Curated annotation (Swiss-Prot):
Annotated signal sequence range: 1-28
Start and end residues of each Bulb-type lectin domain: 31-153
Organ and tissue specificity: Stigma.
Protein name: S-locus-specific glycoprotein S14
GO biological process: rejection of self pollen
Domain (PAN): residue spans on this chain: 338-429
InterPro entries tied to this protein: Bulb-type_lectin_dom (IPR001480), Bulb-type_lectin_dom_sf (IPR036426), Pan_app (IPR003609), S_locus_glycoprot_dom (IPR000858), SLSG/EP1 (IPR035446)
General function of this protein: Involved in sporophytic self-incompatibility system (the inability of flowering plants to achieve self-fertilization).
Disulfide linkage: 376-401, 384-386
Organism: Brassica oleracea
Pfam hit, one: B_lectin
Keyword vocabulary terms for this entry: Disulfide bond, Glycoprotein, Self-incompatibility, Signal
Domain of life (superkingdom): Eukaryota
Keyword GTP-binding attached: no
Length: 434
């Protein structure tokens, strides 16, 4: 009996030993200091307060390349929200993240720096430490300073393909620094892909989804409440737009922080906001484009025409305009758009009011936030190049002035009754005013 007992004990020990070798347990820490490190072999990770996010090493299913990234710790479907070395992976399983000389570096087996924060400053009397915050932000700070304004470095300033609540996409008009999202190469390759989602300041800041030089989607300008072409549901989340000190920025906040939510650029070329459903253990799509509707596609209809969802012909000419090529228009080829029935004369010109619109592209627009709609109308009539005008901000009955001086492109009409859409006033010759 004793012999059998000993054999069982030995077999159990060997089984546990081999399991630990094949599947090493993950050890977590909350703060990384200069006396600690994360290595691939130790399977050690850095965890945020509340165990929401986790930072560590990972590799893709189809390769032996290793990356340093952040993912949701409690989400069963491993979902990465940030990758430090997405375009410079480790080629072997020997890698270390450590703080060295007040600078956390990601090193491969030959002590060559694969990724670094490039941080050179720090308070020698207060050692530098690194944390993953509850919102998923990986930060470096002096050990005696927890204030956000004192962060020495943060991953939120270097987004990859995902926007988290409180994370900003921004454009600095002074330095030209643009923080934007870039898609993955594929579902199993986190390197930089073909699609980007960025804020273009132009006359009125707007978001563009693009693939190289090709524009795929335009959000519409900020109307004081939201970007006119972006869905917004105050029950789940709401948008925040910041414009100050030569810098424009956008972020979203959750109305209930117990929900996990993310906005990301897909490797297949669309923008999607998802929320995690713990009951079904699945990500639910809150909205996605340009998949939701053909009207989301950039310039789905040509000049001086607008897109309408759920109609037999999605493209319609503005009042006072006719298809530039009737035969193509009848064949549902709308790229040529529409042309005026009557040329503008400057004398007797007026306007047709188009309600609930996504404003046309603002590349050639003139913006004056100091005047109202009446003065805006006068300025448009006095400018022979003016083709349309609108309020810049729909709050408080409408303020500011946007004057379009080029062709009206990429417009869309929304459902009647929308409370946060804009009206567009298109200039017409007297003969075409109804």
């Amino acid at each position: 009996v004793r012999k059998n007992y000993n054999n069982c004990y030995i077999l159990s020990f060997l089984l546990v030993f081999f399991v630990l070798i094949l599947f090493p347990p993950a050890f977590t820490i909350n703060t990384l200091s200069s006396i600690e490190s994360l290595t691939i072999s130790s399977n050690r990770t850095l965890v945020s307060p509340g165990n929401v996010f986790e930072l560590g090493f990972f590799r893709t299913n189809s390769s032996s390349r290793w990356y340093l990234g952040i993912w949701y710790k409690k989400v069963s479907d491993r979902t990465y929200v940030w990758v430090a070395n997405r375009d410079n992976p480790l080629s072997s399983s020997i890698g270390t993240l450590k703080i060295s000389g007040n600078n956390p570096c990601h090193l491969d087996h030959s002590n060559k720096s694969v990724w670094s924060t490039n941080l050179t400053r720090g308070n020698e009397r207060s050692p530098v430490v690194a944390d993953v915050l509850a919102n998923g932000n990986f930060v470096m700070r002096d050990s005696n300073n927890n204030d956000a304004s004192g962060f020495l470095w943060q991953s939120f300033d270097f987004p990859t393909d995902t926007l988290l609540p409180e994370m900003k996409l921004s454009y600095d008009l002074k330095t030209g620094l643009n923080r934007f999202l870039t898609s993955r190469r594929s579902s199993d390759d986190p390197s930089s892909g073909d699609f980007s989602y960025k804020l273009e300041p132009r006359r009125l800041p707007e978001f563009y989804l693009s693939s190289g030089v090709f524009l795929l989607y335009r959000s519409g300008p900020w109307n004081g409440i939201r970007f006119s072409g972006l869905p917004d549901d105050q029950k789940l989340s709401y948008l925040v737009y910041i414009s100050q000190d030569m810098r424009v920025a956008y972020k979203f906040r959750m109305t209930n922080n117990s929900f996990y939510s993310r906005l990301f650029v897909s490797f297949s070329g669309y923008i999607e906001q998802q929320t995690w459903n713990p009951s079904s253990q699945m990500w639910n799509s809150f909205w996605a484009f340009p998949l939701d509707s053909q009207c989301y596609t950039y310039r789905a209809c040509g000049p001086y025409s607008y897109c309408v969802v759920n109609t037999s012909a999605i493209c319609n000419c503005i009042q006072g305009f006719n298809p530039s090529n009737v035969q193509q228009w009848d064949q549902r080829v709308w790229a040529g758009g529409c042309i005026r029935r009557t040329r503008l004369s400057g004398s007797g010109d007026g306007f047709t009011r188009m309600k609930n619109m996504k404003l046309p592209e603002t590349t050639m627009a003139i913006v004056d936030r100091s005047i109202g709609v009446k003065e805006c109308e006068k300025r448009c009539l006095n400018d022979c190049n003016c083709t349309a005008f609108a309020n810049a901000d729909i709050r408080n009955g409408g303020t500011g002035c946007v004057i379009n001086t080029g062709e009206l492109e990429d417009m869309r009409s929304y459902a009647t009754g929308a409370t946060d859409s804009q009206d567009l006033y298109v200039r017409l010759a007297a003969a075409d005013i109804v």
